[in-house]
Amino acid sequence: MPGDEQRERTADDAVTEPSRIARLIAVVAGIAGVLLCGLVPLLPVEETTATVLWPQGVGADGNVTELTAPLVAGAPRALDVTIPCRAVAELPADGGVVFSTNPAGGIEAGRNGMFIRANADVVYVAFRDTVAAVAPREAVDSGACSEIHVWADVSAVGADFAGIPDASGTLPVDKRPQVSGVFTDLKVPAQPGLAARIDIDTRFITSPTLLKTAVMVLGLACVIGSIVALALLDRGWRRRPARTRGRAGLWTWITDTGVIGGLLIWHIVGAPTSDDGYNMTIARVASEAGYTTNYYRYFGASEAPFDWYQSVLSHLASISTAGVWMRLPATAAAIATWLIISRCVLPRIGRRVAANRVAMLTAGATFLAAWLPFNNGLRPEPLIAFAVITVWMLVENSIGTRRLWPAAVAIVIAMFSVTLAPQGLIALAPLLVGARAIGRVVTARRAAPGSWRPCPLAASVAVVFVIIFRDQTLATVAESVRIKYVVGPTIPWYQEFLRYYFLTVEDSVDGSLTRRFAVLVLLLCLFGLIMVLLRRGRVPGAVSGPLWRLCGSTAIGLLLLILTPTKWAIQFGAFAGLAGALGGVTAFAFARVGLHSRRNLALYVTALLFILAWATSGLNGWFYVGNYGVPWFDKQPVIAHYPVTTIFLVLAIVGGLLAGWLHFRMDYAGHTEVADTGRNRALASTPLLIVATIMVVLELGSMVKATVGRYPVYTVGSANIAALRSAGDSCAMADAVLVEADPNEGMLQPVPGQRFGDYGPLGGEDPVGFTPSGVSEHLEPEPVGTNPGTPNSEGPVDKPNIGIAYAGDTGGGYAPEGVNGSRVFLPFGLDPSRTPVMGSYGENKLAAKATSAWYQLPPRTPDRPLVTVAAAGAIWYYEEDGSFNYGQSLKLQWGVHRPDGTYQALSEVQPIDIFQQKAWRNLRFPLAWAPPEANVARIVADDPNLSEDQWCAFTPPRVPVLQTAQQFLGSQTPVLMDIATAANFPCQRPFAERLGVAELPEYRIIPNFKQMVVSSNQWQSAADGGPFLFIQALLRTEAIPTYLRDDWYRDWGSIERYIRVVPQEQAPTAAIEEGSTRVFGWSRGGPIRALP
């Protein structure tokens, strides 16, 4: 209107001219900040170089020794080998290995490595089972060639028998071999011409040069100076009064207390996330590795451009690795996010909204319901959620106060969010939604020269270059990204719907009822508010601009998720803050909508009931140990034997019918509003509050019940409580897992004086159908399947992921003859000279049965709680909930051996088995089940089933002295902890990586069988650049019997011992020559080999 324009013109005339100095600083510092920060990716860095030379000394016999040097990247940057041809003549006539980069006894040694082999006829050089050059053995031995020269680098791969015509060749560069050391059968002393040089790929081990550091410091100083100058310029303008926030009311304080209290409880008892172990291990090894290496995959590539958060975690881990300490950033982000919602977001949307107690309580309940299922771990979503809500607040501050410095700070925070993880892009959503309003603020200052306006904002964007490239270069970050796309898994943008599909998958953590509810409520609030705004134009009592921008930020954020290369449902956790704010406004808006129309209220309640029905069709599932003791973790919730999902679905149908009746009734009765009474206002405003509170109570109650109800049996909550009580000195699951250090020591001995047949005391007097070799040669277990969307799995996205595996040495086979004539390969390190075997495999004509001799039980002590039996085949057992698993009967019978030499048989007990399989495992018989007078026990086996797949085998009973995993492993032994287990074993040391070479682990800690098959073994695979790349080349495994204290039915996981294929004495760890070189940001040095 003309009057308004006149007043605005008068106000502009009254504006004080901003300081020329401040404007000059804003322009110059902004431009300098952009240029300096933009140069950071290209500036030189100091790259640490590492080289292994061979030979490195001689053995006791005076001959060269082998070396162990497992390269994290697999292939070296360059390999150069020369072998004098006369040295080949020292091999036997049938030949041997002249030189290899993998030991011949390793898994797929030739497929991955380089071998120079000699046989009786020829000498050949092969890279990854592809021959590069071959020469007659006679010509090589006779001295027709001077040397064998082999090379492999980023430009060429080849071999040459110098002096022999047509005995050379080259191969494509993708044939560069894996190097895990230097291995040879040659028995020769060090001599001229016998040499190998391995240049390790250390491109990611970089540190900024003095020049780069100075440029980064100056660039950040310029950015800060530009923003400060912008703030001073903002002060120089007479602006509209900002919308003032009243003092927080009583219900705000009450809600703050409830939300923060719930978050603190969840900090102690809450379930971990699927990537806690992943990020924990990366953080723990980063310091020695020299960069944030991807420990479990991708050939040791850097985590850049998303690595600054792991750097923070690395500093935290240097203080303590206890879960309650490492999860502090997530809990702090949660508290800060909520306080911004309650003190800034809701007041900005409307003072009446913030003062409405139902809106405030609903915001708190919805926030908790959205936060708890996703954000209680070491993943980046908690920080992203905080960044999103902070950016929205700053954007609103900039728009409301007509100042630009809050927008500049918002951009900086958004840049930190973007570099947290790909889903951090959603922090850009508030900036995109508010860009038009901020643009009007910029153009409104037409009294001042316009050239300075975008400079501070552009400088804020340029900070992203410093965050990403602070110690990496443009080339190394590009290479890291390339490897991750080559290896995968990645999902294209047009399959974004899979993220939502994963929420619907049953028997999946991502499809759990709590995560379904959080996302469905977010979508209901978003689309519900948009419908109200489109239908009515505004929400009475709320400011339309901020409300539209809140909805727009959420919608744009969901669209930005399309750009992420992965589609894990857990990434929805980044919307937890927005969900809380939307929940509060939805309760406020729909209270008025419900009062306006009974039909609309019925539709609102029906939608919530349908959400509950859909959500409760999933499991109350949590990741790994988070399930321990939780009700309904493996099935849909039930009440009085009725599925809860059915109850809510029936109620939703009733609500829908009621809404339909009210809709058609309007044609006859006309529009009727609901009486504005306290009761009706409560009915209209509280449905979402009630529903969200139910879900929060379920989440908190489930975990508190698990912690209290199972105490002192292991749970996440009990581990965290122990950490708090011991000031972080407890060792979580390592204090609860019990280990048989030597199964042979716990083996029971038969009572002397008994009679038994040819098969010894284990077979008893007259076994039928059971023999010492009655075990199948192949004990491959049944395939294990998991549904689509399983985190850290590379299975197909549209169908179940199927895998087959068994632990250590439990897969069967043959071995030298044992104590009772058995030729069965024994698991768990059992000594065949002391361990007899009896089995019914192959007996398909008679009902097999056997009763062993009586074995003497030792005195009962706390460290010997179990009788265990190593067994194989199909065995009858009951699970803890009473469900039955079919197999053949293998029982333990208690007895009494009296002084007069007689025996009294007592009760028989079925074993505890952890899951159906044929492979060797340890059956458990708690001594608490034994009658007090029992002092002997025997095995009673009965196999009447003649089917080929129905048989059982067993070894003598054991009563081992058990020690904790912490006592067994200690805190200095190098260990491979799988992704799922790493966060639960904070005291164990992950094997180190230094100068691009991995330390060989001595043990592996594995999660439960299903998790191992469908996640660990796939994600950490050799083909994808995981630790199995060198482990399968250099180590073999042996399973160790373990149990979870007082939770004997639990398949918690297992521990495996690694045994070197080539002993340490024969192939000691290589000495590495360390150096440094200066490289510029564009220097690539060739690609890392990231192919299968």
Swiss-Prot record:
Q: Which domain of life is it from?
A: Bacteria
Q: Does the keyword Glycosyltransferase apply?
A: yes
Residues annotated as transmembrane: 21-43, 214-233, 249-271, 324-346, 353-372, 382-399, 404-426, 517-534, 541-563, 568-590, 602-624, 639-661, 682-704
**Molecular function terms, GO-annotated:** arabinosyltransferase activity
What EC number(s) is this enzyme filed under?
A: 2.4.2.-
Question: In which compartments does the protein localize?
Answer: Cell membrane
**First-level EC class:** transferase
Membrane disposition:
Multi-pass membrane protein
GO cellular component labels? plasma membrane
Alphabetically sorted, this entry's keywords are: Antibiotic resistance, Cell membrane, Cell wall biogenesis/degradation, Glycosyltransferase, Membrane, Transferase, Transmembrane, Transmembrane helix
Q: Name one GO biological process term.
A: Actinobacterium-type cell wall biogenesis
Q: Which Pfam families match?
A: Arabino_trans_C, Arabino_trans_N, Arabinose_trans
Q: Which residue stretches belong to region Disordered?
A: 772-798
User: What remark does the entry add?
Assistant: This is one of the targets of the anti-tuberculosis drug ethambutol [(S,S')-2,2'-(ethylenediimino)di-1-butanol; EMB]. EMB is a first-line drug used to treat tuberculosis. EMB inhibits the transfer of arabinogalactan into the cell wall.
The UniProt family comment states: Belongs to the emb family.
- Function of this protein? Arabinosyl transferase responsible for the polymerization of arabinose into the arabinan of arabinogalactan.
- Name this polypeptide is given: Probable arabinosyltransferase A
